[in-house]
Amino acid sequence: MPVHIRSSSIALFVCTISLASSVGGQQPPQNWTHFVRIGAYGLSPSNSEKIVRDATTTHVFGIEVDNDIPGRYESFLDPTEKLAAIKAVAEKAHQAGNKAFVYIAGTECITANAEKAPHSVVKDHPDWLQRKITGEPAVFTGGAAFWIREGDEDVWISPYAQPWRKQYMERVRQIAATGIDGIYVDIPYWMTHFDGWEDSWASFDEYTLAAFKQKTNLDARKDLKLGDFSDPNFRKWIDFRISTFTEFLREIRDNARSINSSIMVIPEIYPGIEEEVVRVGADVYQLYGVVDAVAHEYEFGGGDHMAGSRSQLDWFLYQVGLASFRAFAEGKATWLLNYSWDGDKNVDAREAMKTLAASEVMAGVNFWDAPGHSMAGSNDAATRIEIFRWIERYQNALYHARTPFHPVGVYFSPASRNYDAAHFLPSFRGTVLLLLQSHRETQIVTPRTLASFNGTALILPDVSQLSTIERDELKAFMDRGGRLFITGSDVTKFPDSPTIARSASSLGSNHLSRLEKDFMKASQSLQLELLASLPPDSGLRIEASPYVVSYVAKVDGKPHFYLSNFAGIVPHQNVRPTPESATRIVVTASPNATLTFVPFLGTEQTLHGEHSGDQLIFHLPPFDRGAVAWLNDSK
């Protein structure tokens, strides 16, 4: 029998995108990146018209074209032919009322048939290469990754190799001059993600060593205890490596915008909120501040990451990641290149596509459909058209700016994640999961948004690192009536106060541990001590199964509700959720208020509420994957 949770609020997932505008700030205006329905295509000198025609027919808006200039050494040296193709597809896209963006690699560069080629990076510029501390260069060939062919030379270049960087930025400016709408920068990484390089903490090439020496007066080969997160000098190495790619992306955008003031720069990044960020050196929290949107090829942990292979807990953990990305974005767009199906005979690819899409769009994230682990094409073209048509019809409800009501905040501390991931991450994820499953309105708060957070309570889940600025902003939050809930680690140094509640135990970690042991049992017996002590909110709540994730936000002046359902999912067997049939929305509203209800891939239904005092209770029709609803004529 389904378990339903009564709550005084709703897990608010996406409202954080508009936090800056809710208190004293201005949210960036929306643009085409907020409304993309992405399809990808290989670009040649002769197929731009065909690409745009197919995109139009299949309801693609936001055409990705793969025509990498700096990531292929031949075109890095001479980009003439590829630049002409990019210009052609941009013109065709604009004629059709569409937008196009072009793929380029970050620090990876491939030379085809390198042994026979007169030039390659290794032959011409071996000093450019990233290196292990032993001096081993980051050079690979076929088999190192699925996109590298036999005989190809695959290298990873130091972003501090100034001759390369100067030419790279020239290529960026040339691409911007074609009129293309966006530059999609893939894999701007330190080489730590191929076999044998996971613990390298690269790079120790001469260019990088010199830059670190200039910044810190430290010799990275001698003055660090690699892998020791308690070592202050290693922490400087962590910060240096992350800031390197933040500034690299900033420079790409500055160069592109110097030629085309409206061009968008969108990096593709696979690390999300987890410890992989620290190894790879690409931190989406930092990157959102210097680019126009982020495309997340988001995955964590082991496994194949396909929608059809995810457990219920996996789906919920992905939701925590997406919630975090929307908080980091502060009004910018979040794209997601996740994968639905790759040949699993026990899973219907169409069902996997639909469940994946629903889980993303309800979170305010733009859906990118792709087959297997590739970027272009689809596992089922007809299903993609069905999904894209529905998204297009309801794009305003899905993607217009969302603002919060009265959320409980959960603090995401990048420094705690960077230096103490083993304690912070389980606590953070578990806390958010508990709130999501209990249908409390929740907002992820970051150092950039702490000063403007206007919720009633803020939870610090095993936050082990706080700057002076953060402490001052926490004090200001309490001074304006907010309550602080500190669980696990406590480095605030605040004296006891009626506005502070402390728990020595890590409530979030405990909840996550219970879910990992037995997801169903833990979900049906949520430990609600933390929730009982949180301030109640008023006027708005959702009652639903703990297998449903619910978000609420004000969109275009109306309360909107977003529901994602993961009941009944079994990895490699069933990816279509069991319908949820007992969800209720309870609101304080005028007697004549109605609720518009739209199930995923369905059409609008008008619901009338049941009166209970000054409240209306709306009983939602059954839905399987998800639904969006909004209140009309509320007071």
Predicted region positions:
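Bacterial N-terminal signal peptides that target proteins for export
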Residues: 1-11
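Bacterial N-terminal signal peptides
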Residues: 9-20
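Boundary/entry segment of secreted carbohydrate-active catalytic domains
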Residues: 26-55
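Hydrophobic faces of well-ordered beta-strands that scaffold small-molecule active sites
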Residues: 34-40, 63-65, 100-103, 183-185, ...
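Catalytic domains of carbohydrate-active enzymes, especially glycoside hydrolases
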Residues: 45-72, 175-182, 292-294, 356-367, ...
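Acidic/aromatic-lined carbohydrate-recognition and catalytic surfaces
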Residues: 57-178, 190-194
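Polysaccharide-binding and catalytic clefts of secreted carbohydrate-active enzymes
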Residues: 134-319, 324
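Carbohydrate-binding surfaces of carbohydrate-active enzymes
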Residues: 246-264, 270-271, 288-635
